[in-house]
Amino acid sequence: MGFRELIDGSREIDGRVSVNFDMRLESERTGNEPILFREITESPGHSAVMNILTRQRLCEAFEVQPGELIDILSWAMENPSEPILVDGANAPVFENTMDDTDLFSIPIPWHYSEDGGRYQSASIIIAQHGGLRNTSFHRQLVKG
């Protein structure tokens, strides 16, 4: 399931919202359903989504029941496969070509007033060291 498929069926918010608490409040107001925000005050020209990769949606993508998901993920961790490498010409991507990246220009929300600032709430880090690969999920504070 690709990203665009994940946002299909999301409730769309066309009015202006702020990354400063508005996105979280709107999510809570609607029971944390998938939401697509079309107009972000602090990030003109950008859209943002929330709540699109839930356990239920993962189960649907893998065509498994919720009770099976942990066992399947555990099996996959114990039985890793090598990635299939493809030629770059066959896998075009958007690349950052800015000299200085400004994370504050993209719609990263400030969820709670108690937080130290804006957080990427579902960052995926893939690290490799000494032949071992680790994938982990993090909340990452944007500092600057």
Regions found by a protein language model. Give the residues of each.
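Extended, highly charged
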Residues: M1-G144
